[in-house]
C-alpha cells in the first residue's frame, strides 16, 4: 500500500495543481466553471491515456521503438525545462501562451505542454516499473484525478474571491509566476 501512495505522490507532485492553475490563469478567467471542468476533464483523459501507455510499455518505447536510452530522454527533458524556466524569468506569464499556441482544441492544448511533459512521462515509466500494469494504471488515474479535482476547486475559489479581492488574486498570480520560473528552471 505504501508503494502505491509513493507512486501516486510522485506523479501528483509533478502535476502540482497549485502550480498548474497559474499556467491556466487565462483559461480560468475566460471560461465559466462548467466549461472549465469539461475542458480540464478532457485534458486529464488525454494525459491519463498517455501516462498509461508509458506506464505499461515503459522502457520498451525508448529502447525498441525510439532506439534511445531512457536517461537521454530525461536529460533532454531537463534541458527543455531549463529553457522554459528562462523564458518564464524573461517573459513572465506570457510564456505559457507561447508554449500552448493557438489551438482550436483547448483540451489538447492543455494536455500536451502542461500536463504531459518529460517529468510526468518519466514518472509514468517509473510507476510502471514499480507495479504491475493494472495497479500502475490505477495509480496514474488517482494522481491525475486528484490534480484535476483540486484545479476545479481552485477555479471555484478563484471565481468566489476575485470579485471581492482582485488585487490579492493578481498578487498571488504574480508571486506564483515568479516561483514557477524558479521551480521550472531547477
Question: Where on the chain are the PLM-derived regions?
Answer:
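Juxtamembrane transmembrane-helix termini in multi-pass membrane transport proteins
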Residues: 3-53
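Membrane-interface alpha-helices at helix entry/exit sites of multi-pass transporters
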Residues: 32-46, 133-142, 174-175
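Transmembrane helix exit motif
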Residues: 79-100, 185
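Small-residue-rich segments of transmembrane alpha-helices in multi-pass membrane proteins
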Residues: 45-51, 81, 104-121, 173-186
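Small-residue-enriched transmembrane helix starts and helix-helix packing motifs
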Residues: 1-14, 90-111
Amino acid at each position: 500500500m505504501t508503494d502505491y501512495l509513493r507512486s501516486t505522490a510522485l506523479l501528483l507532485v509533478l502535476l502540482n495543481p497549485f502550480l498548474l492553475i497559474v499556467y491556466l490563469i487565462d483559461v480560468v478567467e475566460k471560461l465559466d466553471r462548467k466549461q472549465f471542468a469539461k475542458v480540464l476533464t478532457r485534458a486529464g483523459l488525454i494525459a491519463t491515456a498517455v501516462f498509461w501507455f508509458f506506464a505499461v510499455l515503459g522502457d520498451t518505447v525508448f529502447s525498441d521503438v525510439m532506439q534511445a536510452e531512457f536517461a537521454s530522454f530525461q536529460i533532454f527533458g531537463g534541458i527543455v525545462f531549463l529553457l522554459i524556466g528562462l523564458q518564464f524569468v524573461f517573459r513572465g506569464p506570457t510564456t505559457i501562451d507561447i508554449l500552448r499556441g493557438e489551438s482550436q482544441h483547448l483540451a489538447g492544448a492543455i494536455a500536451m505542454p502542461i500536463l504531459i511533459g518529460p517529468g510526468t512521462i518519466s514518472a509514468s515509466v517509473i510507476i510502471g516499473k514499480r507495479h504491475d500494469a493494472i495497479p500502475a494504471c490505477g495509480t496514474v488515474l488517482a494522481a491525475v484525478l486528484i490534480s484535476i479535482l483540486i484545479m476545479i476547486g481552485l477555479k471555484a475559489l478563484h471565481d468566489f474571491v476575485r470579485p471581492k479581492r482582485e488585487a490579492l488574486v493578481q498578487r498571488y498570480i504574480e508571486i506564483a509566476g515568479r516561483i514557477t520560473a524558479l521551480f521550472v528552471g531547477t
